[in-house]
Amino acid sequence: MPYYPGLNYNQNLTDEKIFIRDRLVLLKQELAKSIPQKTVDKTLLLATWNIREFDSEKFGPRLESTYYYIAEIISHFDFVAVQEVRDDLSALKKLMGILGHSWSYIVSDITEGKAGNGERMAFVYDTRKVRFTNMAGELVLPEKKGTKTLQFARTPYIVSFQSSWFKFNITTAHAYYGKGAIGIKRRTDEIRAAALFLKARSIRETKMIKDKKGLINKWDNYSYILLGDFNIIDREDETFKALTKGTNFFIPEGVLKHNLEGTNVKRDKFYDQIAFLKKEDLLEQGSNAGVFDFYDFIFTENDFSHYKKMMKIKGEKNLKSYTEWRTYQMSDHLPLWVELKIDFAKKYLSDIK
């Protein structure tokens, strides 16, 4: 449960505090309607969220209340993959302080160079539900004989975790964007390369957990999840096909059904995705998935007059510039999430012959 030190009830109750309080209450109510209630050991609420330039202070620093809103959203999940964390971890550490002592994170190093954009990948998770199982690394493509392999612009990050009975290797990625045909080709190639790399790794790993009879011990088998911001244009585009065609990765029906309008603010692009590898493992989707559009409740267009004086931008302060400024407060992406079942006790017992 997030902690809001700046709203201490012992301090003077200003108009600004009332404004923040009312929106936090509304946000809590709407999250409770949209996101299933968290369980102790039955389900895992998994999300991916590109939090725009967290935190570059490009349009001025994020407001204290913004951190409260971000923390409130994250706290309704058990595990969140976050893209666009900056080299300076101050913003992430501040967020963790608001989330509370039961939350932890693991973060990658930045990818050097212009294309890397000084970004990190992070996994933020509730330690009451999820534990790190000691493997973390970055995806580096093997060299092909006679050719130079172009590496990822922003190196995908793979980490192993366990939640109840569910063991998973999860990779978060932020695909190259680029411009024109060349940019889209590199983007498509990156998506396909990441998926195929993980497919090959999974096959290799499965061979290592066979018993003396050559049978796979599925209880030692980790599921593979690939998620993040792939800059996918739409579901008919090659960028989408690169994730699933010939890679053994699939996007659950629940995610496809509830992600009909996209995950960008305009709801017309399918940049963010959550994909799972088809294999002999324990992976069972719950009945819920979705995209949470927080702009229906906070930083709304009706709030422009309130925030106008706080906007640190060049040029005129109008509704158009406000809608851009607010994406540097919250994000230009919306969180995409899925519910997974993680209690396999009955399956385990039924396997005992």
Report residues per predicted region.
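Divalent cation-coordinating acidic motifs and surrounding scaffolds
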Residues: 1-353
